[in-house]
Amino acid sequence: MTYDVVPAFGGRARLDTAFTVALREVVARVPGARGAVFLDGDGEAVDEFAEVPTTEIRILGAHLGILVSLVKEHAGQLGEPLELVIETDRATLLVLVLDDRYLVALEAGPEAQLGVMRRELERAATALRREMR
């Protein structure tokens, strides 16, 4: 895993990991994307990249982690959830389950195309899984 120090939102320096790079790339490749967050199974942010303050994407990630946990708990005979999509009049949220311990989520404006979000978040998920080994 490589590390670089780069300016974060608000001008403060932060340590840039391979996880950050994957998240930054997905945000850059999806028109309208606002941020992406890599989460553990409890909804705690492992890493994030956002065009908005990172606190917002971390809080959103925590809430999405809780939703995925609830879906897993109540899915029963339907099987394990693979993704969660929430569309509102102001945002589209996509969460992919990476494995039994990790998730990745992408937030975008309503203009973002879900198919593009899914394709690019899958690319990021592949990079994240590779780095997790």
Show the residue positions of the predicted features.
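Non-catalytic interaction/Regulatory regions outside core domains
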Residues: M1-R133
